[in-house]
Regions:
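Periplasmic polypeptide-binding modules associated with outer-membrane biogenesis and secretion
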Residues: 2, 24-150, 158, 172-195, ...
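Gram-negative/organellar outer-membrane beta-barrel architecture
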Residues: 106, 111, 122, 126-336, ...
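Short, charged, low-hydrophobicity "junction" segments
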Residues: 20-21, 42-49, 397-405
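Compositionally biased non-globular segments, especially hydrophobic aliphatic-rich helices
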Residues: 5, 21-22
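Generic detection of long, well-ordered alpha-helical segments
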Residues: 91, 268, 318-319, 363-365
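Bacterial N-terminal signal peptides
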Residues: 10-19
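C-terminal transmembrane beta-barrel domains of outer membrane proteins
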Residues: 2, 25, 70-82, 321-323, ...
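Bacterial N-terminal signal peptides that target proteins for export
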Residues: 2-10, 329
């Protein structure tokens, strides 16, 4: 089995280099010609615009940058043949597509013009859309210190292309030094890429991830993992089926903390993992207000570990492992002037089986997880917004030893739970708009433009619904949004355990480039 896995890995490496060029294929999307030139019918006056039917006929792209057309089509859900009744609904459609593309922070600006043609024989009006986009600056290589009370210091040179090959998907490259919460040092290297491309008129994605650590304080200092995968989307009527396959290579994989007592710190040596998966997104065909379409998505994935001669797998790695999951939800969250606006809700359930434990007395082969969550973002004024998240999580036949991940101010590992209800509340104030490019009417100064947000927050959680089992934390976040570089922002968070300020280390710090939720 290991030899087969190696062959699969070699094939995937070949596909990786092939995929580097695939995004530049002229087979970008239906309705786009090779030279992206479309005949635009002359506009006409509307006799009864509210009764007219408009048909999306074509898309023309005017791109200032290197973003690819197929990426815009995918992100904007741009489909020809869509019928829209009423002129006001046509304008809403154009506004919606403009906002949908602007939500992608790899773009600096988006503008869509539309041209209405003469009625066809069936009385419907063809509509041609001209889409103007300008890329923001997306390439950066900077030393970035990052600190989290949960994982320690991470001082890393981070190279990023947030619009790699114009696919609107990032390429991440890290080289750095880490000092974790247990006082252990390591040198790290990471390469992470997902490359979407069009082939055979289908959407594909190539995944290539490499992680290398040198850990001198550990018994096995060298760690390496490679994941190489390929997935494809198959449209089926109004639904989408996604099928994929990942192949992993592991060297000296560290065991989860929950397994170390029984199986030691490491799975020593080399093993490989084959991971086929499939999911099916089934829209219900109606919108939940303005917050997106309700969709049900079942999925199944499996993991088969392959050992090498002389390097047997430990019991916790033997498997095979099967996961059945499904979700029901909707979401639409927009970026408006560096504030978030929108709402999303989801019910998610995951069920896992470890087949190697089924016939072993005292071993539990099954585990399950359920997550019910809702996230809302509201803009009150141009300087103030409110964000909130409600979440219920429960683990069956197991527990989560990092359940504090929903609380800023309490270390993740300090909370072990098999049930948790949590609420997060953020009060987002824009306290500074630093715009020298506007003040001095000089666009060359846009490099120094930024917005500064100050965000008091409160997080609470309970493992059971009683007043004796409540956790409460709070603090402040500061987020810097550079205008010149929309795809990058810096978040600094400081939170405290508000129920016990007497504890010496009752705080949690985060410095990084991701939002909390």
């Amino acid at each position: 089995m290991a030899n087969i896995s190696i062959k699969i890995h070699v094939i995937f490496l070949f596909l990786f280099f092939t995929a580097l060029y695939a995004p530049f294929s002229q087979e970008d999307t239906e309705g786009l010609s090779d030279d992206s030139i479309y005949a635009i019918s002359p506009p006409q006056e509307e006799a009864s615009p509210d009764e007219s039917v408009y048909v999306i006929n074509s898309f023309v792209f005017n791109i200032d940058g290197y973003t690819r057309q197929f990426a815009l089509v995918n992100k904007g859900d741009l489909v020809t043949g869509v019928e829209i009744r009423g002129f006001s609904n046509l304008e809403k459609y154009v506004q919606d597509k403009t906002q949908l593309l602007y939500n992608e922070r790899v773009l600096d600006s988006v503008n869509i013009e539309y041209f209405i043609g003469q009625p066809r024989e069936d009385g419907k009006h063809p509509v041609d859309l001209v889409i103007y986009v300008k890329d923001t600056w997306n390439i950066v290589a900077i030393p970035r210190p990052m600190y989290s009370s949960n994982s320690g210091w991470d001082i890393t040179i981070k190279a990023r292309d947030y619009n790699f090959l114009g696919t609107m998907s990032p390429l991440r490259l890290d080289l750095g030094y880490k000092y974790d919460e247990e006082g252990r040092s390591s040198i790290l290297f990471m390469l992470d890429s997902n490359i979407p491309f069009r082939f055979l008129n289908l959407n594909w994605n190539f995944k290539f991830v490499n992680d290398f650590y040198y850990r001198p304080d550990m018994r096995l200092p060298f760690y390496y993992k490679n994941t190489t995968g390929l997935s494809v989307e198959f449209p089926f009527k109004q639904t989408v089926i996604t099928a994929g396959f990942n192949e992993d290579f592991h060297l000296n994989e560290e065991n989860p903390d929950s397994d170390k007592a029984l199986y030691g710190d490491f799975q020593e040596g080399i093993f490989m993992t084959s991971n086929p998966y499939i999911s099916w997104k089934i829209p219900f065909g109606f919108e939940i207000g303005q917050w997106g379409e309700l969709a049900y998505t079942p999925g199944i994935n499996a993991a088969f570990n392959h050992e090498f001669p002389g390097q047997p797998l430990k019991e916790n790695r033997k498997g095979p492992f099967l996961n059945l999951n499904h979700s029901l939800g909707f979401s639409r969250i927009d970026w408006i002037d560096n504030f978030l606006r929108g709402f999303g809700a989801e019910i998610y359930n995951s069920n896992n089986t470890d087949f190697s434990k089924i016939n072993i007395e005292g071993q539990e082969p099954f585990s399950a997880y359920i997550n019910i969550s809702g996230i809302g973002h509201l803009i009150i004024a141009d300087f103030f917004g409110i964000s909130a998240r409600l979440m219920y999580r429960q683990w069956f036949f197991t527990s989560n030893d990092n359940a504090g991940d929903v609380l800023r101010g309490i270390l993740d590992k300090d909370i072990n739970a098999d049930l948790m209800f949590s609420i997060n509340l953020d009060l987002n104030f824009k306290v500074l708009r630093f715009k020298p490019s506007i003040w001095f009417n000089n666009q060359n100064l846009k490099l120094f433009d930024f917005d500064l947000h100050l965000i008091p927050f409160f997080d609470t959680a309970a493992g059971a619904f009683n007043s004796q089992n409540i956790l409460l934390s709070g603090g402040f976040e500061v987020i810097v949004f550079p205008d010149f570089f929309r795809s990058l922002f810096l978040r600094i968070s400081l939170g405290y355990n508000l129920l016990d300020l007497s504890i010496k280390d009752n705080y949690e710090i985060f410095l990084g480039t991701t939002l909390f939720y």
